[in-house]
Structures are given as structure tokens and as C-alpha cells.
UniProtKB/Swiss-Prot annotation:
It comes from Tropheryma whipplei (strain TW08/27). This is Peptide deformylase. The gene is def. Gene3D superfamilies: Peptide deformylase. Its cofactor is Fe(2+). NCBIfam families: pept_deformyl (TIGR00079), PRK00150.1-3 (NF001159).
Amino acid sequence: MPKISGGKILPIYITGHAVLHAPAKPVTDFSGIQEIVRDMFATMFAAPGVGLAGPQIGLGLRIFVYSYTEGDTLHQGVAINPDLLIPKGVPKRQTHKQQANNSTSCDEPDREGCLSFPGYQFPLERAPQVTLSAFDENKKPFTVHATGWLARIFQHEFDHLQGTLYVDRLAQKYSGEVRQAVLNNKWGIPGKYWVPQEPKE
């Protein structure tokens, strides 16, 4: 996609805000989507992060942006009304209880963070490969076959559109740390947010 420029830096909502914990609705009106995409990229770059979903900026729509550099390759784009497929034979992402009771994994657990649970990272098992099918900001369909960290990013952002944060998927042994983080930061209630700073030139 072309170089991203412009856009407003928006508040990023923190766990407890209702839109983060409810399934997002499909995008049906593409007339103002270009501005939304610019604002989402500006906010993600300022954070900084590698992905940002609509619910994180208080927008309950099925849209996310991503930007991740792997070696000399830049993976960057917007996914609107996405579907995520884990290939047959690849273990599916596990639920909270399944991860607590199942020692088998689909890859080594890398640590994840989230702009809606800022300042913390926890290990989480993810499928090592996925296929993302979605529409871009011009309503053009596309498909991406992703592995490794790009696959992890897609799963993380897709979860946001389902009303799920990555901390909801952690193994049971981390639940105490998650609860304590929420208490310490007075999260878990509607309206909590933070605003990324404008990147310095």
C-alpha cells in the first residue's frame, strides 16, 4: 500500500471499556474509511505498535491496521471485515481453560503485549501460520498467508474484533498478575484511555 501520511492521533482505550469486550460489527459504509485508516495508522505509529484494531480507538467496527518489518520486508496494510483461517492440521488457538490444562502447543510461547493493556507482556501460544482474507480501504479483496510474528499479529488483532484481549487467553498461572495489574492501574472500568505522543522528527 502507499506510504501513510497525515491522520490524527486518537485515544487508545484500556481494558474495561465496553467496546473492547464486545464483538465488532461489519463495515458497511466505506465512504469515510480512508480518514479512519489514516487516523489508525497515525495512532499505531505514535504508540508505537505493530497493530491496532477499531475497538481500541472506541470504534466497534471490524477493521484493523498493521505494520511489521521482517528482515528487509515490510508487511503493512489494513484489513476490513476480515476472516482468519488456521490451516487444517494446525492446532487452533486455545481458550483460557484449554491452555491451563493442555501442555501441548502449536509453537513456542512468545511474549505478547497490547496497547489496550499497556506496559505488560505475557507468554501466549499462537498458531504458527494463518490465512487472512479481508478487504482493503478501497473495498478490494485480498488474501495473505502469514507465518511467525505476522501470523501472531493477525491473530491478536482478529481477537480484538471478537471482543477478546490477549490476556483473556493466558494460561491460568498468569491470571493473578493480570488481576493485580488491573487493580494497580485502576483499570477494568469504562472510559479509561491513554493518548500516544506525537513522534519526534
